[in-house]
């Protein structure tokens, strides 16, 4: 008679901020390969991965994700935006695991300083400011409304920095052209001989993403979806970088006017409408949103701009100092999903 394979199950519970980092380190001290069933959200996955890969040893990690966190972007990106009243939608990854379906690889980003790992987003400017300030509001507003309150404080916050987009061997930096609906070499931008592309601020929005959405219906990077059309779909070792620079507007406007006339339509008629912002253009057909694809980037804040030094790595707020360097990694991480 066949016997079921022996499976050792260990249950852990995190108790404080960064508790999953300590848990990941403890697991890494004993195993080189494991399957982790995570009851949490993006922050828990982020912390767990940081702990698991805190040393230089290669590991093979599989994740079964049960989305019960504040932010569940990774789950919704892989399993769809369903948030029906029936909680069964939360069990898709677990069902895929129990049915022995193949797990899908994750693209991780490493953000320095700090060797932080992200499976969803590394951001600066607006998104980073919202995440930073929302923490101060958590006690008074424990629900998602604190993010809206924080956003209202920063809709007119332009940050000053220089962005350098990095190519990889065989994968040059590219930019989406809404006129042709394709990615191409960014010929109109300043280049270095090694293929780096230089973008000057000020910036209002700057997110590097390996998934398409940050909320079930909020889709800043639609081409990072595994279901995006094949010619537009993000390759495995790339990140999609979404940028809004206010001074690209043909007629100069104040931060208040830009927020009401440009940013709000981009957010609510674009990002909240399944990513339609990628095709929005000014009158002379200049894209409002710059949608880059790269293997990494360097972010260099202006010395006198404290907000520009704020970096968000899957919800963890980091002061990046004089420079942040972010690249995709080769870590072997898979998630079970249908």
Locations of regions flagged by a protein language model:
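Short, well-ordered alpha-helical microsegments
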Residues: 20, 45-46, 214-216, 320
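Catalytic core of DAGKc-family lipid kinases
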Residues: 57-211
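ATP/NTP phosphate-donor binding region
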Residues: 1-39, 44-46, 50-57, 83
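Short amphipathic alpha-helical segments
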Residues: 49-52, 76-78, 219-220
């Amino acid at each position: 008679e066949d016997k079921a394979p022996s499976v050792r199950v260990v249950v852990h519970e995190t108790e404080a901020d960064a508790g999953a980092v300590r848990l990941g380190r403890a697991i890494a001290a004993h195993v080189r390969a494991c399957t982790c069933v995570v009851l949490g959200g993006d922050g828990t996955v982020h912390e767990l991965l940081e702990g698991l890969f805190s040393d230089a040893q290669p590991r093979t990690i599989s994740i079964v994700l049960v989305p019960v966190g504040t932010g569940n972007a990774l789950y919704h990106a892989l399993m769809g935006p369903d948030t029906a009243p029936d909680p069964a939608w939360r069990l898709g990854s677990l069902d895929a695991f129990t049915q022995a379906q193949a797990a899908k690889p994750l693209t991780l980003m490493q953000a320095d300083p700090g060797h932080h790992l992200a499976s969803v987003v590394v951001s600066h400017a607006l998104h980073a400011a919202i995440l930073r300030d929302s923490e101060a509001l958590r006690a008074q507003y424990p629900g998602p409304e604190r993010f809206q309150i924080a956003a209202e404080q920063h809709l007119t916050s332009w940050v000053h920095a220089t962005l350098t987009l990095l190519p990889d061997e065989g994968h040059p930096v590219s930019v989406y052209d809404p006129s042709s609906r394709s990615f191409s070499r960014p010929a109109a931008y300043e280049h270095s001989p090694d293929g780096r592309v230089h973008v000057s601020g000020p910036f209002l929005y700057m997110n590097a993403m390996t998934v398409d959405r940050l909320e079930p219906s909020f889709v800043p990077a639609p081409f990072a979806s595994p279901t995006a059309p094949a010619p537009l779909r993000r390759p495995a070792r790339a990140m999609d970088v979404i940028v809004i620079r206010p001074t690209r507007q043909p007629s100069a406007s104040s931060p208040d006017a830009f927020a009401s006339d440009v940013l709000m339509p981009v957010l609510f008629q674009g990002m909240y409408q399944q990513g339609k912002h990628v095709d929005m253009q000014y009158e002379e057909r200049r894209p409002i949103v710059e949608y880059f694809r790269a293997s990494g980037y360097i972010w260099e804040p202006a010395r006198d701009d404290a907000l520009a030094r704020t970096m968000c790595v899957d919800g963890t707020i980091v002061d990046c100092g004089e420079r942040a360097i972010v690249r995709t990694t080769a870590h072997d991480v898979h998630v079970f999903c249908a």
